[in-house]
Design a protein with these regions (language model features):
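Conserved post-catalytic alpha-helical subdomain immediately downstream of the catalytic base
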Residues: 1-36
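Phosphate/ribose-recognition catalytic cores of enzymes acting on nucleotide-derived substrates
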Residues: 32-48
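Alpha/beta catalytic barrel-like cores
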Residues: 46-181, 237, 267, 279-288, ...
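Conserved, mostly hydrophobic/aromatic
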Residues: 72, 210, 241, 300
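Alpha-helical scaffolding segments of alpha/beta enzyme cores, especially the outer helices
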Residues: 96, 100, 188-202, 226-230, ...
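Catalytic beta/alpha-barrel core
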Residues: 116-120, 169-176, 181-189, 220, ...
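Active-site-adjacent beta->alpha loops and helix N-cap segments on the catalytic face
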Residues: 123-129, 179-199, 245-261, 278-281, ...
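Short beta-strand/loop segments at the ligand-binding rim of alpha/beta enzyme cores
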Residues: 135-138, 203-207, 217, 262-277
């Protein structure tokens, strides 16, 4: 239905993409990508080097994802080691407990889309398999737990290790980053974030960047928006963000504006828990319920740390641990859905 001149422009542009990207038909541009190129052009003769266009290609060809995620996070390592040490349990039992957490999450999900888990590979290998059996959305950490400056679980090439991970697993990277950190620290952390971003894009994997700023400086209305803008400014566009609860609507509005302005294809923001009491989490859900870019939550220790302590100490059974975690997770799911429903009313 297009004029001949437009059809020729489409054909020539598609040919230029296919030749530049070397893989022919798999690299033909999507229609949004084609429109972006024809509207904006490119400063690169080799179109494969244009990161803005490459991002549109990635975002319009990546696998579909649920529009929102409610996740039980059990990727904690040093925290559960501390609990095991406290009650005199061997670290090996942490792996068994994480399998119980999958059972709890699967019970609450009950086969529905939009439920997920954060699970590590160190203690959660079997749990990762079980989560896949239940078709839960899964994010898996790549960072060395607790590291600041950011470091990774694996030495050498990140890509060499990440290529072994199932493609359905979202690669999650936690960075303790405050915009007022010393410049040397900030630049080092940014280099590491760029490494994992490059590895994810090269391998075709979703990347979730988790930012925790409040542990290393004041959490003001502009703190997280400044971090987000800086990460976008250095060319990193994660598929997901995971952020700590904000103290004001102003902060959430600034976060929403920054993400929307810099990456309209971002899948969204997930709110983390930081072991907050249940009532505090409910309030944090209400605070961000009407923010368009916020798409879910990921809460861990509020759900599992007390059952973990009791189970590792031999005070409760497997079934009791699953029941307790499922009850807490279900309560948070209800709080989240109620907050969203109330805001939409």
């Amino acid at each position: 239905d297009e004029p001949l001149e437009t059809c020729c422009a489409y054909a020539n542009a598609c040919g230029a993409f296919a030749v530049s990207r070397l893989l022919c038909s798999p690299e033909i541009p999507t229609f949004p990508e084609l429109q972006f190129f024809l509207a904006n052009g490119s400063p690169h003769h080799a179109l494969r080097q244009d990161q803005a266009i490459n991002h549109v290609h990635w975002a319009t060809t990546r696998p579909a994802s649920p529009p929102g995620i409610m996740a039980l996070a059990i990727d904690h390592r040093i925290q559960l080691e501390a609990v095991a040490r406290e009650v005199g349990a061997p670290f090996e039992r942490i792996s068994d407990f994480k399998v119980l957490a999958v059972q709890a999450a699967a019970r609450v999900a009950d086969g529905r889309q939009g439920f997920g888990m954060f699970i590590d590979g160190r203690y959660g290998r079997e749990a990762l398999f079980r989560a896949a059996d239940h078709k839960l959305w899964v994010a898996r950490p790549v960072e060395l737990t607790g590291s600041r400056p950011l470091d990774f679980e694996y030495g050498g090439s990140l890509g060499t290790h990440l290529i072994e991970w199932p493609t359905a697993q979202v690669i999650k990277c936690l960075c303790f980053y405050h915009p007022d950190d010393p410049e040397e620290l900030r630049l080092r952390q940014e280099r590491e974030l760029a490494r994992v971003y490059d590895a994810c894009r090269t391998l075709g994997r979703d990347l979730l960047i988790e930012i925790i700023a409040g542990k290393h400086g004041p959490l003001l209305d502009d703190t997280i928006p400044r971090v987000i803008q800086r990460i976008y400014d250095i060319g990193i566009k994660p598929d997901w963000w995971k952020l700590e609860p904000q103290k004001s609507a102003t902060a959430w509005e600034a976060i929403n504006e920054s993400v929307a302005r810099n990456d309209s294809y971002c899948r969204g923001v997930m709110v983390l828990g930081l072991e907050a009491p249940f009532a505090d989490l409910v309030e944090s859900f209400r605070a961000c319920a009407g923010v368009p870019v916020v798409k879910g939550f990921a809460v861990g220790r509020t759900i599992h740390i007390d059952p973990a302590r009791a189970w590792l100490a031999g005070k409760i059974s497997d079934a009791e641990a699953v029941d307790q975690m499922a009850e807490r997770f279900a309560s948070l799911v209800s709080a989240w859905t109620d907050a969203r429903r109330a805001k939409a009313a």
